[in-house]
Amino acid sequence: SFLLEKINELSLPGVAFKALKYRPSGTIYQNRVPRYDGQSCSGIQLILKDRNLFNPLLTVTSLMLLIEQLHPRHFRWEDGNYVDKLFGSNELTLFAAQKKSPIDLAAIWAMDVYKFSEFRKPFLLYK
């Protein structure tokens, strides 16, 4: 599929993707029936190749931004700034609006990690 080609072009580290066919089905443990219950659906399977190289945050942000760019009329951010709350800021949705690369976002997060590691040093019991 076109989406699978574009995802593979991202060359995300430690992970591979392949096309997948499946049929959603409800179980007795669910309180609701899946949206496409019993229908044949197409999807993309994520295959972890190297957990040391895999960057889950970069992967998920890259996928969300790619899908938002490829399908802007069908992609919608959750109401109530849900994604902003999950990410701790509105940087992801701003990057999406500005059509920026997730790699740039990863650089900002790396700086945040560095700042936090410096901040916590005085509080560490062991070094």
Residue ranges and their predicted role:
Residues 1-108:
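Conserved functional hotspot residues or short segments at active or partner-binding sites
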Residues 113-127:
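Structural signal for terminal/edge beta-strands and the immediately following C-terminal loop/tail
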